[in-house]
């Protein structure tokens, strides 16, 4: 600080700091309560309840920030507090965090509140936490000894099978398991298939995070196996095989598999963490190289992830010299997109005006992005970070980009000395646009890209998402080869769409016409027409018809819509179906299959399953 207070003499400074910390503590209680409630909903197989819980939790943070801002304005006239007192407020707040279990998240909450009250000129480390002040290393859990951040198990004493069974039962889930002994045997077989027979080192042990990770219809056990110098990650998804009966679905043993389930294209996990930094540290050991910002985001602390990401961006800018440029690919009608080649993200701004045929507004587009944020993304829609008042050095902006910004988004930019301040933007992970992937790829790439594209849209359909504009340029290919949707301005709920077949032409003139000879309502969709803009390349057509010939059949789209209108939720697996135990080791499931067959033969079986 330029004028570091020698004496913290302001009572108002302490009171404001205390009020802000109480606001954060209320937020984090609600955050943890949601994760605790997720366990009950999972046990009850209340999937709609879990979806609502996840949606409500996303909006909870901003609601707590607004509550705190209003309280500070009403009680302390916060906008008129002078600079010296604001500096003392931060120092008092630091003092209050010295024994806190979530100091890094509390610092971010402080920033969120201050940014609502203070002018942008105050966004420096004198007044807010541009850099962290409290270390998060070695924070101990305050829970009872029965629930540390992670538990350590030593299989040498009781054997691996008994240890694995104890790991599962320690989570004390209420529904019984269909056959836990069988499932544990599958885990052991999968470990042997992956690593062969290995000698147990003296330090052979298994570490398991004490809370389950809930998302969709699964609860994940997350841990690591340590043997000598080796550290092996694992994740075990638990699922209901039928109402009220659980099973271990598979075991994921590869880093890449874990990176996918913690990907930016999936919804956030519901997980109870008293010391979130300890969870993030643990997860970092099993997904080495994954930024902490992304890990915080994946466990539901998206504001902390957003804060860390911005710090990473500032750090990168100070240690790089390349320029921001217009993103390669076809320019969008609605968004201006630019990137920094040395930084794996894109920056997206909503244009001031849109040419025909686009009929939308900036407010409507923002609402579409919020819809995606709240919705279950299923690994098929990119998450976005939303920022306001981002200052970028003018010297790092390519001249062509500056001209494009001044032409397309003059209302969003403002020059401030050596910086260009952007009033609003979205930031996403950079991917290879699918149109470029197909254009530059060989036959194998095209087959993979088209198969993934069709799978992505079919999964989005099942999640009640109609992408709207399905051109290949609106999809990207991740570094793991998955196709992900990232253009949201025309997105709709499938249940709001009217699926129609193209009426037969009335005469030869209709048949030769380049315009529709039938009426088209604002929510009408015609799957039969999609081939016109998707199948121009013969290689693409061949792959499309091989893997997704039903894509252009209105019956497929209507069937998914009908299931959604009945309240049915499809099963989704963020891993290849071939690794599921029931597919990988079918011989171990023969008894279960026989029992299921007998149940179906019983007169009341079908009715009870449907009712459930």
From Swiss-Prot:
One of its GO terms (biological process) is glucose metabolic process. Its EC number is 2.7.11.5, 3.1.3.-. GO terms for molecular function: [isocitrate dehydrogenase (NADP+)] kinase activity; AMP binding; ATP binding; phosphoprotein phosphatase activity; protein serine/threonine kinase activity. It holds the Pfam family AceK_kinase. It catalyses: L-seryl-[isocitrate dehydrogenase] + ATP = O-phospho-L-seryl-[isocitrate dehydrogenase] + ADP + H(+). Belongs to the AceK family. Bifunctional enzyme which can phosphorylate or dephosphorylate isocitrate dehydrogenase (IDH) on a specific serine residue. This is a regulatory mechanism which enables bacteria to bypass the Krebs cycle via the glyoxylate shunt in response to the source of carbon. When bacteria are grown on glucose, IDH is fully active and unphosphorylated, but when grown on acetate or ethanol, the activity of IDH declines drastically concomitant with its phosphorylation. This is Isocitrate dehydrogenase kinase/phosphatase.
């Amino acid at each position: 600080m330029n004028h570091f207070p020698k004496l913290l003499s302001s009572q108002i400074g302490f009171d404001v700091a205390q009020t802000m910390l109480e606001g954060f503590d209320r937020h984090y209680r609600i955050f943890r309560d949601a994760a605790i409630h997720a366990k009950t909903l999972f046990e009850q197989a209340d999937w709609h309840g879990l979806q609502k819980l996840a949606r409500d939790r996303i909006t909870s943070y901003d609601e707590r920030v607004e509550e705190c801002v209003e309280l500070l304005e009403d009680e302390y006239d916060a906008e008129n507090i002078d600079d010296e007192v604001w500096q003392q407020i931060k120092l008092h707040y630091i003092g209050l965090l010295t024994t806190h279990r979530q100091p890094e998240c509390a610092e971010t909450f402080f920033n969120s509140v201050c940014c609502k009250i203070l002018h942008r000129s105050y966004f420096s480390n004198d007044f807010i936490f541009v850099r962290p002040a409290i270390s998060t290393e070695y924070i101990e859990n305050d829970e009872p000894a029965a629930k540390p951040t992670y538990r350590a198990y030593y299989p040498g004493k009781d054997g691996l099978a008994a240890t694995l069974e104890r790991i599962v039962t320690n989570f004390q889930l209420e529904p019984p398991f269909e056959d836990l002994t069988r499932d544990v045997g599958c885990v052991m077989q999968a470990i042997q298939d992956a690593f062969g027979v290995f000698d147990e080192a003296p330090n052979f042990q298994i570490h398991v995070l004490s809370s389950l990770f809930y998302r969709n219809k699964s609860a994940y056990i997350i841990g690591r196996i340590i043997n000598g110098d080796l550290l092996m990650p694992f994740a075990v998804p638990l699922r209901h095989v039928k109402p009220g009966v659980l099973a271990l679905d598979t075991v994921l043993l590869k880093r890449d598999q874990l990176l996918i389930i913690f990907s930016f294209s999936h919804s956030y996990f519901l997980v109870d963490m008293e010391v979130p930094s300890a969870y993030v540290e643990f997860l970092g050991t099993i997904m080495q190289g994954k930024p902490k910002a992304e890990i915080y985001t994946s466990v539901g602390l998206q504001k902390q992830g957003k804060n860390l990401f911005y710090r990473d961006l500032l750090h990168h800018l100070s240690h790089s010299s390349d320029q921001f440029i217009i993103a390669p690919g076809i320019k969008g009608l609605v968004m201006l997109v630019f990137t920094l080649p040395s930084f794996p993200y894109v920056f997206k701004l909503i244009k001031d005006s849109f040419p025909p045929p686009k009929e939308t507004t900036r407010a409507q587009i923002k609402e579409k992005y919020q819809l995606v944020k709240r919705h279950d993304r299923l690994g098929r829609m990119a998450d976005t970070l939303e920022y306001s008042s981002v200052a970028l050095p003018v010297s790092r902006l390519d001249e062509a980009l500056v001209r494009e910004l001044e032409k397309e988004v003059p209302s969003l930019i403002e020059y401030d000395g050596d910086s260009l301040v952007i009033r609003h933007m979205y930031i996403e992970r950079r991917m290879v646009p699918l149109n470029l992937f197909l254009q530059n790829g060989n036959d194998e790439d095209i087959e993979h890209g088209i198969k993934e594209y069709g799978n992505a849209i079919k999964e989005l359909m099942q999640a009640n998402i109609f992408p709207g504009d399905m051109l290949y340029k609106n999809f990207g290919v991740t570094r793991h080869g998955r196709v992900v949707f990232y253009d949201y301005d025309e997105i709709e709920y499938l249940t709001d769409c009217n699926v129609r077949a193209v009426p037969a032409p009335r005469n030869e003139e209709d048949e030769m016409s380049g315009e529709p000879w039938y009426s088209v309502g604002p929510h009408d969709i015609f799957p039969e027409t999609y081939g016109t803009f998707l199948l121009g390349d013969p290689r693409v057509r061949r792959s499309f018809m091989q893997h997704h010939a039903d894509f252009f059949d209105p019956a497929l789209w209507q069937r998914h819509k009908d299931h959604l209108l009945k309240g049915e939720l499809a099963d989704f697996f963020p891993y290849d179906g071939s690794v599921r135990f029931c597919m990988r080791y079918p011989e171990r499931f023969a008894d279960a299959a026989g029992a299921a067959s007998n149940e179906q033969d019983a007169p009341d079986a079908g009715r009870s399953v449907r009712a459930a």
